[in-house]
């Protein structure tokens, strides 16, 4: 993933958390905020998920899913993807379909707040 499509500062994450709208499914929470800077995506994996190895593994998988399916994401949105604990048992294909499901759910609502 290119650095221009990542949320990087703590400040940017805070804006998305405070002003964004949250969408859920069984495996992910997705916080979405309308942005004027183009589509940017960040990942947040809590310590409840497991040790650093497990947290980094899920982030690597999610980054790859986003990279390969970037055209599926709505333009002009800042998004924070938060995987839930039960995602550690899913295969790559199941992760991909679950993430795209919650993204479609968010884009159907037009992510307005």
UniProtKB/Swiss-Prot annotation:
Enzyme class: hydrolase
Gene designation: rnpA
Record function comment: RNaseP catalyzes the removal of the 5'-leader sequence from pre-tRNA to produce the mature 5'-terminus. It can also cleave other RNA substrates such as 4.5S RNA. The protein component plays an auxiliary but essential role in vivo by binding to the 5'-leader sequence and broadening the substrate specificity of the ribozyme.
EC number of this enzyme: 3.1.26.5
GO molecular function, a single term: ribonuclease P activity
Organism this protein belongs to: Finegoldia magna (strain ATCC 29328 / DSM 20472 / WAL 2508) (Peptostreptococcus magnus)
Top-level taxon of the source organism: Bacteria
InterPro entries: Ribosomal_Su5_D2-typ_SF, Ribsml_uS5_D2-typ_fold_subgr, RNase_P, RNase_P_CS
tRNA processing as UniProt keyword: yes
Keyword Hydrolase on entry: yes
Name of the featured protein: Ribonuclease P protein component
Pfam family, one: Ribonuclease_P
A biological process term (GO) from this entry: tRNA 5'-leader removal
